[in-house]
């Protein structure tokens, strides 16, 4: 068996630190039926490091999907049941005829405020390079079952994934936090879906590709929104 960790191993609003990283490793260490390497991870918005820090240094050091920081994370890449190809930001592995394409959330490069300054900062982000990699992997594996994963879902696909659906208005008509924090600088139009692609806001890059190539992937795994499984806010 394997598991996909969709992100947010850090549980706070502040940027994560080494103390929290050691706790993540401790919790993984008490798995009873699986090895740490049976869990394949991607970075969530709460796992991001600060804008002035090296990209996702905390998550790379302590969660370490590529097994590059074994002395800290305890992850030994040679013990993966299915070997990975790529980088911490985007990587793949294959189980039989099933191709997994895993993409991590990052800080938006064009922003001067974000994780740390704005806490969780709930708009999802990938680079143009990550989108191109995903598209290329999909197109060169037409006979595979393709499972894509990112911390965020795509726009208008499930609960609270539409514009302004992650927040709500108070009695005076002002926006306030609901499913996610209200972050007008970091998450315009209340976006709590995969919003920035190649630094383009509300890009629709993945959605447009999938609409014009129906059936090109079989499943999109995401998380981010904290709610119950029977919640259909926004009609989804």
Regions found by a protein language model. Name each.
Residues 2, 33-34, 94, 99-101, ...:
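His/acidic metal-ligating clusters that form di-metal
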Residues 7-8, 44-45, 151, 223-224:
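Active-site glycine-centered loops adjacent to acidic/histidine catalytic or metal-binding residues
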Residues 7, 49, 109, 172-174, ...:
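Intrinsic disorder/low-complexity detector
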């Amino acid at each position: 068996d394997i598991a996909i960790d969709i992100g947010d191993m850090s549980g706070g609003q502040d940027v994560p630190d080494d103390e929290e990283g050691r706790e993540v490793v401790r919790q993984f260490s008490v798995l009873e039926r699986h090895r740490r390497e049976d869990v394949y991870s991607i970075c969530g918005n709460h796992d991001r490091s600060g804008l002035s820090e090296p990209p996702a240094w905390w998550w790379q050091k302590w969660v370490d999907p590529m097994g590059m920081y074994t002395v800290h994370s305890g992850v030994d890449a040679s013990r993966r049941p299915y070997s990975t190809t790529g980088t911490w930001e985007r990587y793949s592995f294959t189980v039989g005829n099933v191709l997994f394409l895993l993409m991590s959330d990052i800080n938006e490069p064009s922003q001067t405020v974000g994780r740390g300054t704005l806490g969780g900062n709930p708009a999802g982000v990938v680079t143009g390079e990550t989108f191109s990699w995903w598209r290329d992997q999909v197109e060169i594996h037409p006979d595979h079952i393709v499972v894509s994963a990112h911390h965020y879902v795509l726009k208008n696909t499930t609960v609270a994934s539409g514009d302004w659906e992650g927040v709500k208005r108070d009695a005076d008509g002002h926006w306030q936090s609901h499913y996610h924090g209200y972050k007008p600088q970091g998450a315009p139009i209340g976006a709590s879906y995969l919003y920035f692609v190649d630094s383009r806001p509300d890009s629709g890059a993945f959605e447009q590709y999938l609409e014009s190539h129906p059936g090109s992937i079989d499943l999109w795994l995401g998380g981010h929104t904290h709610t119950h499984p029977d919640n259909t806010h926004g009609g989804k």
